[in-house]
Amino acid sequence: ALQLTGFDPVMASIRHYDFADAAKDTPFYKEIIQAMLDYFETEHYVFTHGWIPSIPNRDKSYSYISSWREADREQWNQARWFNGMDAAQTADENKTIVCGHWHTSYGHSKYEHKGTEFGEDADFSPYYGPGIIAIDACTAFSGKVNCLVMED
């Protein structure tokens, strides 16, 4: 979405609500994303764009909604833009959520203290944490694409 909105990666991470609003006004969001499934679930994994519906709290944490599978369109539209690495504590106990949307260098930098988000030492490889595998390599910036082989 960076290339569609004109935001640079640093400003998108600082002004993420403005970035999300700008992204929602692109043909990608209006046409392609609207045609996508909200999630795909296997025995061990849930695949989704941003995250599962959760309640964002003022302290930037998220509260789990046990009925997320029955969430309405608005809840899914909101969850699509969540940063899964910040919301990872709101995962089902026996599932790992595989998500994109937010650059993996954020998780490596914030939670592993490994490199910076966008510096020369930024790590755009998949981010693995409790209940989450994040795969967004921020391709427009990093020139990389992350791929996983899942055997489930």
What are the roles of these predicted feature ranges?
Residues 4-133, 138-143:
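Acidic, His/Gly-enriched loop-helix segments that form or flank divalent-metal centers
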Residues 145-147:
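C-terminal regions of proteins
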